[in-house]
A protein has these predicted regions:
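Positively charged, small/polar-rich N-terminal and surface patches that mediate targeting and assembly
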Residues: 1-108
Length: 108
């Protein structure tokens, strides 16, 4: 089971509830919210700019599919950004904690 970071952008007003839902469902061990992000993107033929919050969810590759489905269900965007990045290395005790928090039989 490998640890991953999942990057998700969301409107500032939706981000805290989304983060809490992912942690409560044990789909992520932790979600950092980085407010104040400005995104520039092309949508439906137009260049757009929007203020967003970046969510960085720590989870495992085994939980990614369920996390993605939860984000798609809860997210206000028609096409939310959900990007997984593999972790090559991490502080071993932190990695153990992360894995335990998204397991079916978590430790405290």
């Amino acid at each position: 089971m490998s640890a991953i970071l999942v990057l998700i952008t969301a409107p500032a007003e939706a981000a805290p509830a989304l983060a809490r839902a992912l942690v409560e469902a044990r789909l992520a061990a932790c979600v950092n919210l980085l407010p104040g992000l400005r995104s520039v993107y092309r949508w439906q033929g137009e260049v757009c700019e929007a203020g967003e919050t970046l969510l960085i969810a720590k989870t495992t590759s085994a939980r990614f599919s369920a996390l993605r489905e939860a984000v798609l269900r809860l997210h206000p965007y028609e096409l939310p950004e959900i990007v997984a990045v593999k972790l090559d290395d991490a502080h071993p005790p932190y990695l153990q904690w992360l894995l335990s928090q998204v397991s079916d039989s978590p430790s405290p």
